[in-house]
Amino acid sequence: MTDQLTHFNEQNRARMVDVSEKDVTKRVAVAESQISMKPETLARIREGRIEKGDVLAVAQVAGVMAAKKTWEIIPMCHPLPLTGIDIQFAFEDETTLAITGTVKTTGKTGVEMEALTAVSVAALTVYDMCKAMDKEMIIGPTSLQSKTGGKSGDFHRGEK
């Protein structure tokens, strides 16, 4: 793995990396985020009693849409043909909702940013739908858990 930054040109200005010479490989990235809230708020999400609707269904769709649009909001991301996006939720305890996003493609560049964007927007959507009853919700941490495929090799959080 290289420590050299690749998003700058000879004039030290930002550029989109040229991936035309890279090999096409299967790539998978998994990201996680969480949102902490009052126990009553999480209970109402679990029971489907939020006035704006089914929070998890809307957040799931928002996460999928965000992954597909990542290249439009992160300036140096490449537009990618994503082959799979999965957003999952877990009630970690009485105050924490965990969000996991898995994004897949077969291409010349990875999908880490798509996975991170997916879980971030899913968490923001939960916040938006519940803010009327709980403005003290906290989003994070958000992190890349793993990525496979590509020139830089595989990454699994916690492994050396």
UniProtKB/Swiss-Prot annotation:
Keywords: Lyase, Molybdenum cofactor biosynthesis. Pfam families: MoaC (PF01967). Substrate binds at M76, C77, H78, M113, E114. One of its GO terms (biological process) is Mo-molybdopterin cofactor biosynthetic process. SUPFAM superfamilies: Molybdenum cofactor biosynthesis protein C, MoaC (SSF55040). Pathway: Cofactor biosynthesis; molybdopterin biosynthesis. The active site is at D128. The keyword Lyase applies. InterPro entries: MoaC, MoaC_bact/euk, MoaC_sf, MoCo_biosynth_MoaA/MoaC, Mopterin_CF_biosynth-C_dom. One of its GO terms (molecular function) is cyclic pyranopterin monophosphate synthase activity. CDD domains: MoaC_PE. It catalyses: (8S)-3',8-cyclo-7,8-dihydroguanosine 5'-triphosphate = cyclic pyranopterin phosphate + diphosphate. Its EC number is 4.6.1.17. Homohexamer; trimer of dimers. Catalyzes the conversion of (8S)-3',8-cyclo-7,8-dihydroguanosine 5'-triphosphate to cyclic pyranopterin monophosphate (cPMP). HAMAP family: MoaC_B (MF_01224_B). Belongs to the MoaC family. This is Cyclic pyranopterin monophosphate synthase. The gene is moaC.
